[in-house]
UniProtKB/Swiss-Prot annotation:
The gene is trpD. Keywords: Amino-acid biosynthesis, Aromatic amino acid biosynthesis, Glycosyltransferase, Magnesium, Metal-binding, Transferase, Tryptophan biosynthesis. This is Anthranilate phosphoribosyltransferase. Homodimer. It comes from Pyrobaculum arsenaticum (strain DSM 13514 / JCM 11321 / PZ6). Its EC number is 2.4.2.18. Pfam families: Glycos_trans_3N, Glycos_transf_3. Anthranilate 1 binds at G80, N111. The keyword Protein biosynthesis does not apply. Anthranilate 2 binds at R166. It catalyses: N-(5-phospho-beta-D-ribosyl)anthranilate + diphosphate = 5-phospho-alpha-D-ribose 1-diphosphate + anthranilate. GO terms for molecular function: anthranilate phosphoribosyltransferase activity; magnesium ion binding. One of its GO terms (cellular component) is cytosol.
Length: 333
């Protein structure tokens, strides 16, 4: 099927198969479609609602265009969609650090914030991490340090082709869903936060289609994280099967605490670091709840409750902050 036929299919409100979505994605990133056609296709999918098959097809395409990290060991990621507009500190990145400190091997994939206060890359840059770490170095850091951060634009340069259209559209597109699933190390284990509840099943089903071994997709009380404030809806993907459930902080042995908010980047960094050091209880608990699920999907623990206990211990004993310092120093040598 040619690209024009795919556009007509979208224009008629029909869903694409995974193979058709792959072809459309290739057409977009290879420059075979003009900006008007790209905008039309992204809008059609957004208005109708992106399907799991379309997301999976786009992810396969994105992986093909990516700069690959040659991982030699299994690793986990905590990348999410972002865009919840909640103004919270960056929990997913801090949680990745804690998970690494507690025994997981982590290849954290992330970007700067496009619309919110603070993205993963903003945090890592603020603490001194070298965002230009290349693929071989990243693989080495995962093995030797247990943590590496890979900056999305460095590893997905082809995405720059569609950036002007994405910026011009007043809504998030399928690329915001694809990014978190397109880790350049092809990780098969991941904690994935989504900003919209409607995306829970879409992303979980796409992860299953993509062959993830163990993924947990979460949306908690208006944030794309496991929430320390109230209930979190979870879709768990394990070897192709999907299970939906809800959890609350107390289910993991955690108190209900507010997720720390920040009004600027400096405050966001300070509160996240205080949480990693165990100096700000609310931040530590919120970070540890997310690290608990990262440790769970990594296979370090058999239950998120055990993961929370392990994560809190890593924070309280200073291991988590030392892991951050180690990772930053290693990225610059």
């Amino acid at each position: 099927m040619d690209l024009k036929a795919l556009l007509r299919k979208l224009g008629n409100g029909l869903r694409l198969t995974a193979d058709e979505a792959y072809l459309l994605g290739r057409g977009i990133l290879s420059g075979s479609l003009c900006d008007v056609e790209v905008a039309a296709s992204l809008t059609a999918m957004r208005v109708r609602g992106e399907s799991p098959e379309e997301v999976a097809g786009f992810v396969k395409m994105a992986r093909e265009f990516a700069v690959r990290v040659p991982l030699r060991i299994e690793a986990v990621d905590t990348a999410g969609t972002g865009g919840d507009g909640a103004g919270t500190i960056n929990l997913s990145t801090a949680a990745a650090i804690v998970a690494a400190a507690a025994g997981a091997k982590v290849l954290k994939h992330g970007n700067r914030s496009a619309s919110g206060l603070f993205g993963s890359a903003d945090f890592m840059e603020a603490v001194g991490y070298n965002l230009e770490v290349g693929p071989e170095k990243a693989a080495e850091l995962v093995e030797k340090v247990g943590f590496a951060f890979v900056f999305a634009p460095r590893y997905h340069p082809a995405f720059a082709k569609v950036a002007p259209v994405r910026r011009a559209l007043p809504f998030r597109t399928i690329f915001n869903i694809v990014g978190p699933l397109a880790n350049p190390g092809l990780v098969k284990r991941q904690l994935i936060g989504v900003a919209e509840e409607r995306l829970l099943e879409v992303v979980a089903a796409a992860a299953a289609e993509l062959g993830f071994e163990h993924a947990v997709v979460v949306h908690g009380s208006g944030v794309d994280e496991v929430s320390s404030e109230g209930a979190t809806t979870v879709y768990e993907v394990k070897r192709g099967s999907l299970e939906r459930y809800q959890i609350a902080p107390e289910d993991l042995g955690a108190p209900r605490v507010p997720i720390p908010r920040a009004s600027d980047k400096e405050e966001a960094v300070a509160k996240a670091l205080a949480g990693l050091r165990g100096e700000l209880r609310e931040a530590s608990v919120a970070i540890a709840l997310n690290a608990a699920f990262a440790l769970y999907v990594a296979g370090v623990v058999g239950d998120p409750r055990d993961g929370f206990e392990l994560a809190m211990r890593a924070i309280q004993e200073g291991v988590a902050y030392r892991k951050l310092v180690e990772a930053v120093e290693a990225s610059r040598t």
